[in-house]
Amino acid sequence: MIMETESPLSITSPSPSDSTFQVDMEKTMHALPSSLLDSPLLSTNEHYPPKSTLLLSGPSPIRNIQLSATKSSESNSIDYLTDTQNIFPNFVNNENNYQFSTAPLNPIDACRVGERKVFTTGNVLLSADRQPLSTWQQNISVLSESPPQNGIQSYISSSEQAAQALTRKPSVTGFRSSSLNSNSDDIDIFSHASRYLFVTNLPRIVPYATLLELFSKLGDVKGIDTSSLSTDGICIVAFFDIRQAIQAAKSLRSQRFFNDRLLYFQFCQRSSIQKMINQGATIQFLDDNEGQLLLNMQGGSVLSILQLQSILQTFGPLLIMKPLRSQNVSQIICEFYDTRDASFALDELDGRIIHNCCLQVAYYDAMADSVSTSSASSLSVPRGFSGMLNNNSEWNNSMTMSSNQETPTAASCAVSRIGSSYGMSNNFGSVPLGRTESSPAWGTSGYYDVSSTSPVAPSDRNPSRQYNSIRYGLDVNPIAPPNSSRLKQRNSDLLNGINPQWSPFSSNTGKVFDSPTGSLGMRRSLTVGANASCSNPTNLSFASLTLHDSKADSTLSASSLNPDLNLQRYTPTVEKHASDRNSVDYAQIASGIDTRTTVMIKNIPNKFTQQMLRDYIDVTNKGTYDFLYLRIDFVNKCNVGYAFINFIEPQSIITFGKARVGTQWNVFHSEKICDISYANIQGKDRLIEKFRNSCVMDENPAYRPKIFVSHGPNRGMEEPFPAPNNARRKLRSIASAQQIGLFPPTASKC
């Protein structure tokens, strides 16, 4: 049943456990600004029957979770359940097991992924949406307390259901745009979907504000390039979410704009935009975050598929996840539909330790230059890694596998996709299969398709299904800020399985794990009590974990490395490539080639305050910047050694750099040398969007990001920071801060 409540809610577990997770909703709601309290997400109006999905959502099954409240009245959910089953006729309702829809996703419409309803045993209604108040600690602790049994682990619980799925044909007509005449039209267009729309036939005199208003109605717009609008009637629109980009494309095909004008569009790949930038175009919205993350797992254990999926889906819906290389299951690539979810996941998970496993996370660029070695064969994957890694087999469009089969082998996990881009779903001949009865495992040449919530495998070889692919070498460069705490001595380590500062358990007494060191010289450590089981990480509950900060020696000796690791695999070329990408070149700025405006100021004395930093910058650049944020370690109220500043004009970077870079700060007896590099997030608007829904805006005003007037007579004067505009992200940030602290000093956030 869906429960209507008039009192604070809490998430509890029926069975007593040391790791029971509770959220104080009353305290959380008081932390929200009044402007968000009227949000439909928080409304008790009967027009929003699945309102409990704000607390519990996500396609990953979580057992033994229920909503409890006082003074509650039950509302009848039978009609809603019936309506949902009418919408999804292939939905299987089994009272004993968790069930997912056995119908393959429509290959032309990824937007329906967020609409799929999932029901579980009991009275809790879950939806395939994100989990704002649930944290990844809750998910992993629940998995540890109640490891999935054979009957629960399988998303298709019986061989009969799997057999039915094999005979079911996916519908390709249900979500077709009204202006399309055939299924092949959708397939041709949306098989190459991306987050970028190349729109033509626009009026050449239309204002930028009008375009922004138009496309914002179709989805969350990341940016619009109008450099060719006045001459050719062309613009490039970037969306945060690829599903919204697809929906916007459908709207453009079925509607007319600007006095009955039909707009034409084409999906534009990131590589094409990068070529335009290389040829002198000024496109501000392109950055390293394409929703793709590279996760490297270090330590005594590797998280299972179910655990990783449960953790990652806490931050938002996943498009895909798979191993980086076929023989290494400790390096995983995942992609979120929404790039903002990827940024949030990176911020929260990088440097975290879960069950004797240290997670190192960085952005992954599938189009980056590969570093090939003669000792390893390259991997063939399509753009957006929507296809499948399989060095010894062709692309396939159909498969057969028994539901009670053992763990998939090297050739058992494969799938064919429509097109070579983001691959919204399985191909026509492909159907999702149930998980095996053995524990979840990565196929050595497979991946885990979270869109269909099940591994898939090939049976036939179909030469007609061959697709063009891009060859990648053994080592691929993850793009992140150079010389930051995340990338300093870590780019190549991350890709080659080396973590110089990671030490597994060595005894049964209290142990300390150190995550990578931040700029402050502080490192995030996690102590495990002696009562925790070290031999079996799945028995390790979060109740026995304690986070603390300790002084760390920033130097690295060879003896601190694991002797079992192969140090010869270190590839300085990868780190150099990332460093060159974000290094500041005054000549390129002066010539107008590099138009980036946001930089990271590094090596700041830790006792420096934000006001002191403003005074330091104003000596040479007063009134030339409109955003400033000195990141703070809220444990000791000191900065973490770096700040982010957005200059109004790129030429101001030259003025500041020539005056300050390479000089000492000459304060607090510090011998640090000022340095700068480009930040990942560029532009005042995008920086505001990143921080406006963050818990940091609830801290002391002296610790918050500051924005300033960019133009006009008041240029350089501080202006109010915009209020939050996303209730989910705000609630999620509050819950995360309650559990793991606010912005722990593990990595750079911009």
From Swiss-Prot:
Regions of biased composition (Polar residues) lie at: 7-20
SUPFAM superfamilies xref list? RNA-binding domain, RBD (SSF54928)
What does UniProt give as GO cellular component?
cytoplasm; cytosol; Mei2 nuclear dot complex; nuclear chromosome; nucleus; Tor2-Mei2-Ste11 complex
Instruction: Give the Gene Ontology MF terms in alphabetical order.
Output: lncRNA binding; poly(U) RNA binding; protein sequestering activity; RNA binding
Q: What induces it?
A: By nitrogen starvation.
What does the entry give for GO biological process? cell cycle switching, mitotic to meiotic cell cycle; meiotic cell cycle; negative regulation of conjugation with zygote; positive regulation of meiotic cell cycle; positive regulation of metaphase/anaphase transition of meiosis II
Q: Does the keyword Phosphoprotein apply?
A: yes
Residue numbers spanned by region Disordered: 1-20
Q: Which UniProt keywords apply?
A: Meiosis, Phosphoprotein, Repeat, RNA-binding, Stress response
| Gene3D superfamilies hit by this protein | 3.30.70.330
Ranges of residues in domain RRM? 195-270, 293-361
Describe its PTM? Answer: Inactivated by phosphorylation by ran1/pat1.
* Entry keyword annotation includes Phosphoprotein: yes
Query: Other comments?
Result: The expression of mei2 protein is negatively controlled by cAMP.
Report the function annotation for this chain: Crucial for commitment to meiosis but it is not sufficient itself for the commitment. May be a splicing regulator.
Q: How does it assemble?
A: Binds rad24 when phosphorylated.
Q: What is this protein called?
A: Meiosis protein mei2
